[in-house]
Amino acid sequence: MKIQKHKEIYWGELRGASISKTRKDFTYLYGSTIIFHSPDQVYFENKLIASGQTIHEWSSSWNYQGDRQVPSLPLLKRGRSYSLTRDMTSYPSESVFLKLIFFDRYNREVSNHVERSDKMTFTYPEEAYSYKVQLLSAGVESFEFHCLRIEEILEESNG
Protein backbone atom coordinates (compact mmCIF):
# COMPACT_ATOMS: atom_id res chain seq x y z
CA MET A 1 0.00 0.00 0.00
CA LYS A 2 1.36 3.41 -1.02
CA ILE A 3 0.01 6.76 0.11
CA GLN A 4 -0.05 9.79 -2.17
CA LYS A 5 0.29 13.04 -0.21
CA HIS A 6 -2.22 15.86 -0.48
CA LYS A 7 -2.06 19.38 0.86
CA GLU A 8 -2.67 19.89 4.59
CA ILE A 9 -5.98 21.47 5.60
CA TYR A 10 -5.82 24.17 8.25
CA TRP A 11 -8.55 25.70 10.43
CA GLY A 12 -9.28 28.54 8.02
CA GLU A 13 -11.56 31.50 8.64
CA LEU A 14 -13.92 32.01 11.55
CA ARG A 15 -17.51 31.97 10.33
CA GLY A 16 -20.20 31.70 12.95
CA ALA A 17 -23.36 29.69 12.26
CA SER A 18 -25.39 32.92 12.49
CA ILE A 19 -23.39 34.44 9.60
CA SER A 20 -23.74 31.48 7.28
CA LYS A 21 -27.40 30.74 6.55
CA THR A 22 -26.46 27.49 4.84
CA ARG A 23 -24.14 26.55 7.73
CA LYS A 24 -21.22 25.85 5.41
CA ASP A 25 -17.73 25.94 6.85
CA PHE A 26 -18.70 27.40 10.19
CA THR A 27 -17.14 27.51 13.67
CA TYR A 28 -19.08 27.17 16.93
CA LEU A 29 -18.45 30.58 18.51
CA TYR A 30 -21.00 30.76 21.37
CA GLY A 31 -19.02 30.87 24.62
CA SER A 32 -15.85 29.71 22.86
CA THR A 33 -12.33 31.01 23.32
CA ILE A 34 -10.37 30.63 20.08
CA ILE A 35 -6.74 31.70 19.85
CA PHE A 36 -4.90 31.65 16.50
CA HIS A 37 -1.22 31.18 17.26
CA SER A 38 -0.49 30.46 13.57
CA PRO A 39 -2.39 28.86 10.66
CA ASP A 40 -1.30 25.41 11.90
CA GLN A 41 -1.85 26.02 15.62
CA VAL A 42 -5.34 26.97 16.85
CA TYR A 43 -6.44 26.72 20.48
CA PHE A 44 -10.17 26.14 21.16
CA GLU A 45 -11.81 26.14 24.60
CA ASN A 46 -15.47 25.82 25.58
CA LYS A 47 -16.19 23.83 28.74
CA LEU A 48 -19.97 24.05 28.25
CA ILE A 49 -20.28 22.85 24.65
CA ALA A 50 -22.83 20.04 24.32
CA SER A 51 -21.80 16.59 23.15
CA GLY A 52 -22.69 16.05 19.50
CA GLN A 53 -22.34 19.76 18.65
CA THR A 54 -20.37 20.59 15.50
CA ILE A 55 -17.28 22.58 16.50
CA HIS A 56 -15.88 23.37 13.05
CA GLU A 57 -16.70 22.35 9.49
CA TRP A 58 -14.85 22.27 6.16
CA SER A 59 -16.58 21.83 2.79
CA SER A 60 -15.52 20.83 -0.73
CA SER A 61 -18.40 22.73 -2.33
CA TRP A 62 -18.97 26.48 -2.51
CA ASN A 63 -21.05 29.06 -4.28
CA TYR A 64 -18.26 31.57 -4.88
CA GLN A 65 -20.61 34.38 -5.88
CA GLY A 66 -22.62 34.01 -2.67
CA ASP A 67 -19.87 33.21 -0.17
CA ARG A 68 -16.72 34.73 -1.73
CA GLN A 69 -14.76 31.70 -0.55
CA VAL A 70 -12.97 28.85 -2.28
CA PRO A 71 -13.46 25.23 -1.18
CA SER A 72 -11.40 24.32 1.87
CA LEU A 73 -11.18 20.61 0.97
CA PRO A 74 -9.54 18.99 -2.07
CA LEU A 75 -11.62 17.38 -4.81
CA LEU A 76 -11.62 13.59 -4.56
CA LYS A 77 -12.07 10.93 -7.24
CA ARG A 78 -15.08 8.61 -7.13
CA GLY A 79 -14.36 5.02 -6.13
CA ARG A 80 -10.87 5.78 -4.78
CA SER A 81 -9.73 5.04 -1.21
CA TYR A 82 -8.46 7.79 1.07
CA SER A 83 -7.09 8.28 4.55
CA LEU A 84 -8.28 11.20 6.71
CA THR A 85 -5.97 12.07 9.61
CA ARG A 86 -6.30 14.83 12.17
CA ASP A 87 -3.33 16.34 13.97
CA MET A 88 -4.66 17.69 17.26
CA THR A 89 -4.48 17.24 21.03
CA SER A 90 -7.73 17.35 23.02
CA TYR A 91 -8.59 17.49 26.71
CA PRO A 92 -9.96 15.09 27.82
CA SER A 93 -8.29 12.79 25.31
CA GLU A 94 -10.44 11.28 22.54
CA SER A 95 -13.23 13.79 23.21
CA VAL A 96 -13.49 15.04 19.61
CA PHE A 97 -15.04 12.96 16.81
CA LEU A 98 -14.39 13.27 13.08
CA LYS A 99 -17.50 13.18 10.88
CA LEU A 100 -17.32 12.79 7.12
CA ILE A 101 -20.53 13.47 5.13
CA PHE A 102 -20.98 12.80 1.39
CA PHE A 103 -23.59 14.58 -0.78
CA ASP A 104 -24.99 13.96 -4.26
CA ARG A 105 -25.35 16.65 -6.92
CA TYR A 106 -28.70 17.76 -5.41
CA ASN A 107 -27.07 18.24 -1.98
CA ARG A 108 -28.81 15.18 -0.50
CA GLU A 109 -26.76 13.14 1.95
CA VAL A 110 -25.45 9.93 0.39
CA SER A 111 -23.63 8.54 3.43
CA ASN A 112 -21.59 9.55 6.46
CA HIS A 113 -18.86 8.14 8.69
CA VAL A 114 -18.07 9.06 12.31
CA GLU A 115 -14.73 8.15 13.90
CA ARG A 116 -13.36 8.72 17.39
CA SER A 117 -9.73 7.94 16.56
CA ASP A 118 -7.30 10.31 14.84
CA LYS A 119 -7.40 8.41 11.53
CA MET A 120 -10.10 6.98 9.29
CA THR A 121 -10.03 5.33 5.89
CA PHE A 122 -12.89 5.63 3.43
CA THR A 123 -13.82 5.13 -0.20
CA TYR A 124 -15.32 8.14 -1.96
CA PRO A 125 -18.80 6.98 -3.10
CA GLU A 126 -19.57 6.75 -6.82
CA GLU A 127 -22.73 8.86 -6.40
CA ALA A 128 -20.99 11.58 -4.32
CA TYR A 129 -20.60 15.08 -5.73
CA SER A 130 -19.22 16.91 -2.67
CA TYR A 131 -18.34 16.26 0.96
CA LYS A 132 -17.86 17.88 4.36
CA VAL A 133 -15.57 17.15 7.29
CA GLN A 134 -16.75 18.12 10.77
CA LEU A 135 -15.20 18.12 14.23
CA LEU A 136 -17.85 17.03 16.76
CA SER A 137 -17.76 17.50 20.52
CA ALA A 138 -17.81 14.35 22.64
CA GLY A 139 -17.35 16.03 26.01
CA VAL A 140 -14.37 18.14 24.95
CA GLU A 141 -13.26 21.07 27.10
CA SER A 142 -10.32 22.31 25.01
CA PHE A 143 -8.02 21.28 22.19
CA GLU A 144 -5.01 22.39 20.18
CA PHE A 145 -5.68 21.91 16.44
CA HIS A 146 -2.89 21.71 13.88
CA CYS A 147 -4.25 20.31 10.61
CA LEU A 148 -6.19 17.63 8.74
CA ARG A 149 -4.62 15.47 6.04
CA ILE A 150 -6.49 13.69 3.27
CA GLU A 151 -4.25 11.27 1.39
CA GLU A 152 -5.07 8.89 -1.44
CA ILE A 153 -4.28 5.23 -0.78
CA LEU A 154 -2.74 3.65 -3.87
CA GLU A 155 -2.83 -0.13 -4.11
CA GLU A 156 0.41 -1.72 -5.28
CA SER A 157 0.13 -4.32 -8.01
CA ASN A 158 2.38 -7.37 -7.76
CA GLY A 159 3.66 -8.04 -11.21
Curated annotation (Swiss-Prot):
GO biological process: protein transport
Superkingdom of this protein's organism: Bacteria
Keyword vocabulary terms for this entry: Protein transport, Translocation, Transport
Protein's UniProt keywords contain Glycosyltransferase: no
Phenotype reported upon loss of the gene: Loss of export of cell wall protein GspB, the protein accumulates intracellularly in protoplasts.
InterPro entries listed in its UniProt record: Acessory_Sec_prot_Asp3
Family: Belongs to the accessory Sec system protein Asp3 family.
NCBIfam families per UniProt: acc_sec_asp3 (TIGR03711)
Subunit structure: Part of the accessory SecA2/SecY2 protein translocation apparatus required to export cell wall protein GspB. Binds the Ser-rich domains (SSR1 and SSR2) of non-glycosylated GspB, binds much less to glycosylated protein.
Function: Part of the accessory SecA2/SecY2 system specifically required to export GspB, a serine-rich repeat cell wall protein encoded upstream in the same operon.
Record protein name field: Accessory Sec system protein Asp3
Organism from which the protein derives: Streptococcus gordonii
Encoding gene per record: asp3
